[in-house]
C-alpha cells in the first residue's frame, strides 16, 4: 500500500495569483498557462488489491516565467514544459488538431437516477483512472444508493474521478456536488494534466470550452478527443518520467 491512503486536503492551499487563470491551446502547439496557476504533481494511492483509493500530493514545480507553456505533443525533452519540439515533429509523430466538441455535457451524458441521488456519465471524457471500479462499480452501486454505506462509497468514487466523466447531484437538474479546489494543474505520472478548480480552456479558434471543475488535458499527443485526454496514453505506453 502507498504511504498514504487519505484524500488530498485542499484547505489552506496556497493561492498563487488574484488574476484569472486561463489555458490557451496554441494551434498545433503548446498549452499556454496564464494567471500564475500552480503546477504540481499528483499520484494515485492503491490498496493491497491494487485498486486506486485516493490521490497523493507531490512536489510543486518552480515557475520562473509567466505565462508558461506546457508540452502538448508528448515529444518535449523538458517535460512537462514545452521546448518547441512540436515545430520539428513529423506528421506521423504529432497532429495537434482539436477534435473535442464544444457542446455542453448535457447533450452527451447518460443519467443514472438513484434514491436521493443522481449520477451522470459523460463517457468520452474518461481517462482510465479506475476509481469507479471498486465495490462492483458505481453503475451497479447506484441501484443500491439508499444504503448509507453504498452511498458513501459512490460519492467518494465519483469525486475522485479526475476527468469529470462522472458527476453526481442530489436531485435531477440539480447542481453537481463538487470539491472546491484552488485553480491548479497537476501533472499525473506518465499521464495527462489534471486541471482543477474551473480553469477556462480556450481552443485555438478562440472558443472557450464549458468550464468544469475537473478536467484532464492530453499530454501524450495522441488523444482522439484533443485537447482532452481519452486514455490513449495507456494504450501507447506513454513515458514522460
Where are these regions (language model features)?
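Extracellular/lumenal glycan-associated surfaces
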Residues: 30, 34-36, 80-86, 134-137, ...
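Iron-sulfur (Fe-S) cluster-binding modules
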Residues: 1-27
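Cysteine-centered iron-sulfur cluster-binding motifs in ferredoxin-type domains/subunits
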Residues: 24, 70-80, 118-136, 148-164, ...
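Non-heme iron-sulfur electron-transfer modules
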Residues: 18, 25-26, 40-42, 46-54, ...
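Extracellular/periplasmic metallocenter environments
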Residues: 66, 73, 79, 86-93, ...
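A short, structured beta-strand/loop element
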Residues: 31-60, 124, 133, 138
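A cross-kingdom feature marking solvent-exposed beta-strand/loop segments within repeated
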Residues: 47-67, 202-215
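Short, solvent-exposed interaction modules
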Residues: 107-127, 134, 182-211
Amino acid at each position: 500500500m502507498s504511504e498514504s491512503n487519505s484524500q488530498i486536503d485542499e484547505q489552506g492551499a496556497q493561492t498563487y495569483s488574484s488574476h484569472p487563470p486561463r489555458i490557451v491551446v496554441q494551434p498545433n502547439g503548446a498549452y499556454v498557462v496564464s494567471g500564475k496557476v500552480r503546477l504540481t504533481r499528483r499520484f494515485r494511492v492503491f490498496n493491497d488489491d491494487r485498486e486506486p483509493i485516493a490521490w497523493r500530493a507531490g512536489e510543486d514545480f518552480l515557475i520562473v516565467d509567466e505565462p508558461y507553456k506546457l508540452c502538448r505533443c508528448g515529444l518535449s525533452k523538458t517535460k512537462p514544459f514545452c521546448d518547441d519540439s512540436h515545430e520539428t515533429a513529423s506528421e506521423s509523430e504529432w497532429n495537434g488538431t482539436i477534435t473535442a466538441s464544444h457542446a455542453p455535457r448535457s447533450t452527451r451524458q447518460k443519467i443514472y437516477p438513484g434514491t436521493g441521488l443522481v449520477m451522470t456519465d459523460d463517457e468520452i471524457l474518461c481517462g482510465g483512472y479506475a476509481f469507479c471500479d471498486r465495490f462492483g462499480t458505481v453503475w451497479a452501486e447506484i441501484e443500491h444508493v439508499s444504503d448509507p454505506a453504498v452511498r458513501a462509497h459512490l460519492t467518494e468514487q465519483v469525486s475522485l474521478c479526475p476527468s469529470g466523466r462522472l458527476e453526481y447531484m442530489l436531485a435531477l437538474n440539480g447542481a453537481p456536488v463538487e470539491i472546491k479546489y484552488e485553480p491548479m494543474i497537476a501533472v499525473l505520472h506518465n499521464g495527462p494534466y489534471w486541471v482543477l478548480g474551473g480553469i477556462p480552456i480556450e481552443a485555438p479558434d478562440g472558443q472557450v470550452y464549458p468550464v468544469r471543475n475537473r478536467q484532464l488535458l492530453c499530454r501524450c499527443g495522441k488523444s482522439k478527443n484533443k485537447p482532452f485526454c481519452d486514455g490513449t496514453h495507456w494504450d501507447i505506453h506513454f513515458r514522460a518520467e
